[in-house]
Amino acid sequence: MIKRLLLQHSLRLLRGCDLTEIYLGGGLIKNPVGGHDSVYRAEVVGKTGVKAKIVAYSVSKSGQRIVTFELEYPRTIHSEVRTHCMLDMNASSSRAIPMKFMRDHVLENTAFPVVLTKNQSGMQGRELHDGWIDLNVIADVYKHKVKTVVNFLKGSGAEFDEEGLRISFNNYIKYWVLSAVTADHEVLERSGLHKQVVNRLLEPYQYIKTIVTGTEFDNFFNLRFQEDADPTIIELANLMAYLYYNTEPEELSWKEWHTPYVLHERDVSGKLHYFVRNEAGEKEYLSGGRDGDAVKVSCCACAQVSYRKLDTSPEKVQRVYDLLINGGIIHGSAFSHVACPMCSMSASIVDGESVNMPVLPKTWQDGITHMDRQGNLWSSKFKGWIQYRKLIPNENCVSFDYEKRKQEVYSTVVGSQLTQLGGG
């Protein structure tokens, strides 16, 4: 049903979205971008630089799909993307990005809205704005003379209509607004403030990169690929849906793993092998299985979404892994993107034993968390797939000691500045 609605709406909405670049578009996308050894199966680029890439796309023998996207979109719509609780996500953090790099990145890759509409009541504009900003309005708001505004824009190198005394929305943001915001950003940096405070100033103009994995995308497409949604998230959902319905998933069997950023190949016997490329471009094969290096490398790669360059070297992987799992508090979200098919979606016999009998939870595979009213077995948010996170002991804290933690936090430099509750 959702696929049919997407196809019905696609021509109308594409006029507003205007896809600018599609890799391997037209028909099923069977080959990865950049060849069979690329970490990306397919990629599509839309207006204003919104991007969707498929990192891994798998289907079980029973036909249940799981897909991992790498997305880039304006941070302004991130809260709306995050409302979809059936999808697991990791996102780049302003707290992890050096300030100078953030400033340069925002100036070079400013995040703009996909569509500009005129103001009216309600959440959605229905009439297109021409995108021109009146220099007289700028002068009036800032209490400048128009000549002062004109001279500033000339000095900044901005293109604008001097005769008509107007400037495009994008150039206004880039040359007027960001000239002030980035200057303030640098002032705060040079004053010694931490990037977790300073970088927040630039978030409205920043692209965010996210890793999104799920087995259930119908509701996301249904809510976000329709005309009442924010135009920028319509664009994002459109790109994702295009790839989802036009890319051929890789079939995986029980005990074979969906591993974003870790590549697969089968030998003549049909056995699946896992590998990554080192800096020299050579294949480095990784052990498979639940406790293998392929799973570990994939999880750590997903955790590197804030990094400028993916690093799957053993040294980097070990450092990231230790930060995620060996620091006393488990940061489990990066382990949510790796999964393997359930041995069966219903009761079956495996190695002479009854497995996954719906009414007998003790027969369920490790990692299965619940059954829905239709009798489908789930592992957290994944239907028909075992999420690796659910195989990690203590991945979810169920015995938080507030009084103990309160003492630990209050004794730190930052904690000493918080509201001290309960007598310390």
PLM feature segments, named:
Residues M1-G424:
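A conserved ligand/cofactor-binding region detector
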